[in-house]
């Protein structure tokens, strides 16, 4: 194990990785096993965007957006994002919501408010946070940091299967191209580029089942002397 941090009364496990690496599913199952809270950081931005539309707040009204983010009632469970107690998992995937998320995230105070909300998810008995910069930016003191990797081909196949199961049509070659382009953007961006923390455990899930990936994360957690 790379981490030698002592027991933390409110431990955080971060699970970062590229698109379709399986981080969301693994994080949800680890959280369920440990009885920890769950944070889907990517969905948080979309939830704020959806709420801003529903409450009629303009994308340029920074003060109102910050207050909205501070007051949002958000809950994450396996495969489910709730806003004010209502499942909005499908609503936040709409293209218009994604566009609004991009529009509000350009404001520094809005980003700061969203970072604060992410950190506020750290509550007893613990938190599992998934995203792209959880271990490097949001929770640099996490007791366990995991960075999931997988080949672009494996991730494209997973995303294709997910879309087909939800009734959407998709071309696997297009998905593969899009993933590679996004990987390049995420890895080379100036602010918080997608990369593992120096003390992260690397987990290649290309040939692993979900259960195998979850078991490995739990093994690492137990090896730190943490109850699991």
UniProtKB/Swiss-Prot annotation:
GO terms for biological process: nucleobase-containing small molecule interconversion; pyrimidine nucleotide metabolic process. CDD domains: CMPK. It catalyses: CMP + ATP = CDP + ADP; dCMP + ATP = dCDP + ADP. Its EC number is 2.7.4.25. One of its GO terms (cellular component) is cytosol. HAMAP family: Cytidyl_kinase_type1. This is Cytidylate kinase.
């Amino acid at each position: 194990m790379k981490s030698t941090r002592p027991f933390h009364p409110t431990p955080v496990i971060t699970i970062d990785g590229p698109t379709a690496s399986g981080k969301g599913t693994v994080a949800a199952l680890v959280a369920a096993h440990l009885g920890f809270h769950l944070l889907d950081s990517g969905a948080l931005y979309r939830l704020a965007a959806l709420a801003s539309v529903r409450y009629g707040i303009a994308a340029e009204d920074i003060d109102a957006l910050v207050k909205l983010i501070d007051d949002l009632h958000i809950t994450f469970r396996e495969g489910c994002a709730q806003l004010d107690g209502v499942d909005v998992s499908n609503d936040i995937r709409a293209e218009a919501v994604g566009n609004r998320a991009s529009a509000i995230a350009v404001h520094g105070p809005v980003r700061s408010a969203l970072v604060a909300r992410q950190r506020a998810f750290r509550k007893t008995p613990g938190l599992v946070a998934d995203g792209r910069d959880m271990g490097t930016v949001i929770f640099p003191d996490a007791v366990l940091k995991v960075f999931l990797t997988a080949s672009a081909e494996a991730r494209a196949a997973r995303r294709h299967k997910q879309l087909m199961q939800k009734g959407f049509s998709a071309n696997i070659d297009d998905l593969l191209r899009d993933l590679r382009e996004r990987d390049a953007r995420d890895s080379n961006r100036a602010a918080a580029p997608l990369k593992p923390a120096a003390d992260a455990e690397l987990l290649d899930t290309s040939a692993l089942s979900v259960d195998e990936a979850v078991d490995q994360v739990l093994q690492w957690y137990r090896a730190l002397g943490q109850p699991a």
